[in-house]
């Protein structure tokens, strides 16, 4: 089951939290849900060069609180806060009212350990027609330098322009999808290339969350685990040259 279900939805309330935190009456729920969809689309579209890792939405009465997690907070804030003000005005026009919107910008501590940013990086390289094997290898190396416990990347579609679509994946370290206490960061993105659509999936294992304690990486039986990783490891060969 852990291999098929969405890793984030599988762990809601355990290691993952909801990206939208508000309550509403039954009649207003669809309207507010569509507003959340519009807000996230607007932020991701207009701040595509800021490395947006996620947008958390909270509602208090008629006020909307946004928490924008980004790799480049200076791009979002702008000079003298002009970026935030223009973003607020644009969101009010998108929603069609003048409700107060409070925006809090949070910098991502480890950029190369965020599944969303890793997937965005791979998509950008695939659109530039870089070999997918080379891109995946570079992304894994950057994630390992960032200190992740494990990472798995899958790319599917007409890889390198092949006539028959296929999917290939590689994994480094542990990615325990069946373990509920495992903090798994997951993201899915699509790349529009001249040969068609390529799907990119990224799983990042950041350690196990022990109840009543901070997030801790598991270091039990390192030698045995290393031997298992060597047996299960699958390397991409770069045949683009």
UniProtKB/Swiss-Prot annotation:
GO molecular function: mRNA binding; rRNA binding; structural constituent of ribosome
Record's keyword terms, sorted: Ribonucleoprotein, Ribosomal protein, RNA-binding, rRNA-binding
Disordered: annotated segments: 213-241
InterPro entries listed in its UniProt record: KH_dom (IPR004087), KH_dom-like_a/b (IPR015946), KH_dom_type_2 (IPR004044), KH_sf_prok-type (IPR009019), Ribosomal_S3_C_sf (IPR036419), Ribosomal_uS3_bac-typ (IPR005704), Ribosomal_uS3_C (IPR001351), Ribosomal_uS3_CS (IPR018280)
Domain KH type-2 residue range list: 39-109
Span of the signal peptide: none
Gene3D superfamilies: 3.30.300.20, Ribosomal protein S3, C-terminal domain
Pfam (any one): KH_2
CDD domains membership: KH-II_30S_S3 (cd02412)
GO BP field: translation
Self-association and partners: Part of the 30S ribosomal subunit. Forms a tight complex with proteins S10 and S14.
Family indicated by similarity: Belongs to the universal ribosomal protein uS3 family.
Job of this protein: Binds the lower part of the 30S subunit head. Binds mRNA in the 70S ribosome, positioning it for translation.
Protein name: Small ribosomal subunit protein uS3
Organism, scientific name: Acaryochloris marina (strain MBIC 11017)
Organism taxonomic ancestry: Bacteria, Bacillati, Cyanobacteriota, Cyanophyceae, Acaryochloridales
Gene transcribed to yield this protein: rpsC
